Amino acid sequence: NNSKLSISYLFADTDGGCENFHLPLQIICRPERGGGNGEHFMKKRVVVALGHRALGTTLPEQKVAVKQSAKYIADLIEEGYQVAITHSNAPQVGMIHTAMNEFAKAHPEYTPAPMSVCSAMSQGYIGYDLQNGIREELLNRGIYRTVSTVLTQVIVDPYDDAFYTPTKVLGRYMNAQEANEERKKGNYVIEEAGKGFRRVVSAPNPVKIVELDAVNALLDADQIVIAAGGGGIPVMEQDNHLK
C-alpha cells in the first residue's frame, strides 16, 4: 500500500523445494470481468514472488529452477496479465558478500564490499537468469515481449527497530566453529535446529520504492518487469543523496 504500485493480484511461492518443483504460485485473487453483452477480460497486474526455494542455491540449480518458474509466468502472460516479478536473494547475496570479502583479504588494496553493493549484484545476476529464462519461454510460444530487470532501491527508516534485531538469513549453513568465527567479526549468527548456523542481517521495512515510476512505466508499456529483488536495496535519504 505504501508503494502505490497499483497491484490487483498477489502470488506467493510455496515451500516445495527445487527437487519437488510443482506449481510455485498460489493465486490469492482472481480477475474481474465486465458485465452485459460487452463482457470482456480486463487486463490486470499481478506480482509473482519467488522465494529462495524457487531459485535454488547454486548457479546450476538456479538455471533449472528459473526454467520451471518461467513456464508458469508465461502461462499468466498468455492469459493476458501484466506481470511484475520479485524474488528472494538470501543465499545469493550471502555468497557474493563472502566472495567479495575473501577477495579483499587476499588483495588488501581492495576494500570489502558493503551489503548494499552485494544486494545490487544479486539483483543483477538473478535478474539476468530470470530475464533470459522468461524471454526464452515466451519465444518458444511465439510471444514477443520485452522482459526488463530494474535495479531497485527502497528507502528505509534509519530508526527502524529491525536494525537492532537482525532477522534476514543469508549465505550458506555453517558449523559451530565457523559460526564462532563470524561472531568474532561482529556479525549476528543464529542456529537453525538440525541444519546448522546462519548469518543474519537487518531487514528494515521499505518506506518507498525509489524506482517506482520506472517500474510503472514499463508495466504500462506492457513489458514484463523484474524488480525489488531481495526486497530492494535498502537506502536512507540524506538531503538529495541516498546512502
Question: Which role does the model predict for each range below?
Answer:
Residues 54-56, 224-243:
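Conserved mixed alpha/beta catalytic, RNA-binding, or beta-rich assembly cores of soluble enzyme
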